[in-house]
């Protein structure tokens, strides 16, 4: 387990609720972070924004000896203490369980009973590039769920949980424990925790500039092309827009 990582404050998480994933992606690209968008991971409950800190869980292909390794007590007697339970117990308000299932969207990482623990821990949500069993039931808990799919199958014949709060991949991108996980209608973006505060103001300004462009071009009936890339005219209409907000 990683001993220490940057824990982004709840106040910063709250701020990102109103920032678009596309804007965050653009700001990260400027800094050389190109692989931060998860492939094949989509919301099972469209319309639910997700912002939270990653608690990571890694799955491996199943094998009998791995089953023996990860099951530490009382299997089948209510005391199955695998790493999946460790990950769920590690959650706190503002955290997101992020499970690396090697892109196996048809393989379950858990179902409605297991993932009820996310609700009782008051965590922010669930992200996995694997599948979610009983997905239609899990989304009734009300938290955001982003996954590679919904499936009726159980996972154990194919995968087993292996380790918690270590760097993982999910949807083909790196997720470090504590990274900020952002989910919207476009999918899931991973914001490195050390950059969360640094890029926030630039993200807000970018969204404001684009809103100013949209309002101006709609009002005047002109093409947005005159304001991209951002230029002196862009700055002019942005300042006018900003003044109207104050």
Model-predicted regions and their roles:
Residues 5-78:
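N-terminal low-complexity or amphipathic/hydrophobic leaders
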Residues 8, 220-246:
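Acidic/histidine-enriched, glycine/proline-rich intrinsically disordered or flexible terminal extensions
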Residues 28, 118, 179-181:
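Buried hydrophobic positions in well-ordered alpha/beta secondary-structure cores of metabolic enzymes
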């Amino acid at each position: 387990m990683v001993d220490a990582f940057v824990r982004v404050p709840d106040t910063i998480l709250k701020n990102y609720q109103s920032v678009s994933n596309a804007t965050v992606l653009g700001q990260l690209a400027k800094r050389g972070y190109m692989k931060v968008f998860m492939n094949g991971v989509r919301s099972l409950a469209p319309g639910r924004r997700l912002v939270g800190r990653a608690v990571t869980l890694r799955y491996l292909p199943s094998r009998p000896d791995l089953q023996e390794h990860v099951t530490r007590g009382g299997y089948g007697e209510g005391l199955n203490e695998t790493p999946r339970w460790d990950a769920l117990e590690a959650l706190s308000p503002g955290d997101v369980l992020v499970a690396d299932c090697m892109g196996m969207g048809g393989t379950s990482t858990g179902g409605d009973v297991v993932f009820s623990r996310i609700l009782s821990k008051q965590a922010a949500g669930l992200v996995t590039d694997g599948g979610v069993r009983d997905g239609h039931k899990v989304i009734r808990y009300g938290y955001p769920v982003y996954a590679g799919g919904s499936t009726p199958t159980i996972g154990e014949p194919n995968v087993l949980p292996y380790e918690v709060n270590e760097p993982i991949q999910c949807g083909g991108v790196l997720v470090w424990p504590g990274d900020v996980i952002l989910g919207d209608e476009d999918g899931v973006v991973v914001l490195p925790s050390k950059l969360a505060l640094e890029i926030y103001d630039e993200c807000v300004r970018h969204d404001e500039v684009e809103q100013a462009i949209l309002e101006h071009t709609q009002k005047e009936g002109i093409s947005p092309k005159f304001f991209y890339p951002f230029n002196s005219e862009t700055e002019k209409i942005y300042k006018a827009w900003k003044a109207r907000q104050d």
